Amino acid sequence: MKTDAFALRHIGPRETDLQHMLQTIGVDSIEQLVYETLPDDIRLKAPLNLDPAMTEYEFANHIQELGKKNKVFKSYIGLGYHPTIVPAPIQRNIFENPGWYTAYTPYQAEIAQGRLEAILNFQTTVIELTGMEIANASLLDEGTAAAEAMALLFDVRTRDQKKNNTHKFFVSEEILPQTLSVLQTRSTPIGIELVVGNHETFDFSTEFFGAILQYPGKYGQVNDYGAFVAKAKENEIKVAFAADILSLAALTSPGEMGAAVVVGTTQRFGVPMGYGGPHAAYFATKDEYKRSMPGRIIGVSVDANGNRALRMALGTREQHIKREKATSNICTAQVLLAVMAGMYAVYHGPKGLKYIANKVHASAVTTAEALNKLGVFQTNTAFFDTILVKADAQKVKAIAEKNEVNFFYPDAESVSISLNETTSVSDINQIIAIFAEALGKEAVTVSELTTASQLPASLERTSSFLTHDVFNNHHSESQLMRYIKKLERKDLSLNHSMISLGSCTMKLNAASEMLPLSMPNWNSIHPFAPVEQAEGYITMLKKLEQQLNVITGFAGTTLQPNSGAQGEYAGLMAIRAYHLSRNEGHRNVCLIPSSAHGTNPASAAMAGMKIIVTKTTPEGNIDVEDLREKAIEHKDDLSCLMVTYPSTHGVFESSIIEITKLIHENGGLVYMDGANMNAQVGLTNPATIGADVCHLNLHKTFAIPHGGGGPGVGPICVNEKLVPFLPTNPILKVGGEQAITAISSAPYGSALVCLISYGYITMMGAEGLKSATEHAILNANYMKSRFEGHYPILYTGECGRAAHEMILDCRAFKENGIEVGDIAKRLMDYGFHAPTVSFPVAGTLMIEPTESEDLAELDRFCDALISIRKEIEAATADDKNNVLKNAPHTLAMLTSDSWDFPYSREKAAYPLEYIADNKFWPSVRRVDDAYGDRNLVCSCAPIEAYMEN
């Protein structure tokens, strides 16, 4: 046996476990199990045509060699991406630490207090630097955040504006080009008309509901927008700012100028450029708009003892509850990167951020003054970090690239130079020497940075920020390291136990896949660097696209969408473009089964589609007759069907080919949601079932870690007819011949983390990928067999099998006074994160073990739920003081002098023998969600200030 095969490390069950597992299920082989699970007509007839699998050692050498093809030049391109210094303790203790990167979105607050606090720090940083009242837990990138700001301002129009269909949105010509492209994509299907122009000549017409300004502008100009905002307010036009987060340590905050929304990226707070991402965008607004905000919001509440506890707030705004009426389709954002950016603010504190901002500004002023002496004149009347000079762009570019330096060239006579945190005096002298050579003059040299500010006094920041203790007490490395560890210890991640969240695929994120992310050759490249400097990246990304084409059976892939929700949106926009190209723009009806994930209707609404919900049968399958009826009824305006396969109920529906054929016969296309692709890879694929487009979650099926709520990557794979419509980028041309405008800010989205999926596929190979799928199905059916007789299993296939996940029905336990949430909280006492609660059916648990979990871990989890089942039996409806209702139990409870519970401390904390060996303690008791929403606090202000009398 090849013991160096990566698949052996990735897949949990050992060869010696198989017989026992198969026997428990009641089959003779994995082949028989797969045969009984997958419909015969959708099985692949040949293995995937992929390269032979590499070992981990071979991949490490391969990725290092490939990385050498990337040329890391000094980058002064700017445009929202800047070289930054990643503090080593943050890189080592967060970015490279599975305790942080393998966690899931903090749905179970009691075992997520660490990252909830870290995100609260991020929100506080954003609120105080922007001068706003509330901020969310991050968004995907600056372009997406700007589009969400536009959507929010459209949503909060006045009654008269809605009545009069006021639909124009002003965009300053200073906006970043990639942001403009994303705004164009988002505005068209929802009926918003963009008007791009000079803010100084804007007429404040009543036809406008909102405006967005860049602060500072794309080439560095800093404007005082106070008068603009005041005039806009008089005309009921609300103004959003896209602001550079570092500049706000030196400049007057947008909040002080009257902004309604402020967005931007926190990339330059210690997160590497990574050829475009991932980075955490931010979104801040006024308290009055909180219920229209997109994304997650972390708020302060109390636990069952009245102690301060954190949790996700205002969840009813989100797509999994509001569906097509949600504020946004975004679920996964960029939590890991938000944690890094927030910790950067903690480490540097207000004085440190001010120092860095002033140093960056001084570098820009020093460069401008030196170039001025050469006769190269700067055109910005005021600037923070970026200067725009008049020069022969072609000549400067040739000399700069010879010296391994990148500037940005807006036109033939202009050069934009964006200075950053890493810029030194010797870097400035190199810049001066490049221009001197271009002019044929002798270079002047500088020996130190100037102390003179170039900012107008009216725009210099005078207000304080980050005054809370957390930003002023962790400035030595020991302090920071211990603070990070303190938070990490409060969180349950994959490095402690399995996380069986259904529809989330919490599989192994192997160290060998993650290592390249820390290599400078991969993480230090600007997304708009000339392509010849990114040969390693282009090779890797194109290869990954080819691998995904083979796996899905499709003809083309774009990696641009940087979350599953963005992938859904991109797929629907490609379908929309296809119909428009055939003069069938009237095709706008989207059929969605009632069992679909909430992102589906939310994405369809964003794509301007009319949503028709189709029924499901009592067995949980799509009701084919109801679908037929609705497809025929809407055949003249049918755009598409959105279908998840295997279904959200964890079943391979045998009628899938009939379903897709039905849609095609009535003029529509089929969009397959790839959330459950982990049950397909190597066994079947979207093309075989008749889909036209699918999105994949690289953070599920293809091993990118969830990061506590992001990053994610949601590429779309399409058939021949949709290839021409894959999205482009305004600076680096990518996508199809009739490409839609940008979905995300960067041409390849979150390119850096694509290395993980590339590594996963490359090391697994065709055989390993197929084996992973088979073992995912094996693990799910083994658990299902163990649960039978203890919990009703809600849906199964025709042979009684689950796909890769199953639903346990907990609704009957209400007779014993037990809710499904009680089971979720009690699992924490057993050392486990709960499965998915009340989705897709209220009162149920959806369990997905993945292929990475070994037999011993599966058994521990099964033992825990079976033990809880016995505890449920012992409970009575009128008993509110039992071990389930009081769960989870904290160490403080167990060690308290008083114990007023009718069960032992041992039963509370150590209900099964295995727990004592590796006990995980929740850090708070059950969190009061309702209290937190009534008393919303989303920053680090002391809780006492917000308590109701």
Curated annotation (Swiss-Prot):
Molecular function via GO: glycine binding; glycine dehydrogenase (decarboxylating) activity; pyridoxal phosphate binding
Catalytic class of the enzyme: oxidoreductase
Keywords attached to this entry: Oxidoreductase, Pyridoxal phosphate
UniProt-listed PANTHER family: GLYCINE DEHYDROGENASE (DECARBOXYLATING), MITOCHONDRIAL, GLYCINE DEHYDROGENASE, DECARBOXYLATING
Oligomeric and partner information: The glycine cleavage system is composed of four proteins: P, T, L and H.
Gene3D superfamilies per UniProt: Aspartate Aminotransferase, domain 1, Type I PLP-dependent aspartate aminotransferase-like (Major domain)
Gene Ontology cellular component annotations, sorted alphabetically: cytosol; glycine cleavage complex
Domain of life: Bacteria
HAMAP family: GcvP (MF_00711)
InterPro entries: GcvP, GDC-P_C, GDC-P_N, GDC_P, PyrdxlP-dep_Trfase, PyrdxlP-dep_Trfase_major, PyrdxlP-dep_Trfase_small
Record's keyword annotation contains Oxidoreductase: yes
GO terms (BP aspect): glycine decarboxylation via glycine cleavage system
Cofactor dependency: pyridoxal 5'-phosphate
Catalytically driven reaction(s): N(6)-[(R)-lipoyl]-L-lysyl-[glycine-cleavage complex H protein] + glycine + H(+) = N(6)-[(R)-S(8)-aminomethyldihydrolipoyl]-L-lysyl-[glycine-cleavage complex H protein] + CO2
Protein name: Glycine dehydrogenase (decarboxylating)
Primary role: The glycine cleavage system catalyzes the degradation of glycine. The P protein binds the alpha-amino group of glycine through its pyridoxal phosphate cofactor; CO(2) is released and the remaining methylamine moiety is then transferred to the lipoamide cofactor of the H protein.
TM segment ranges: none
Family affiliation: Belongs to the GcvP family.
Keyword Oxidoreductase attributed: yes
Catalytic activity, EC: 1.4.4.2
Record PTM N6-(pyridoxal phosphate)lysine, positions in chain: 700
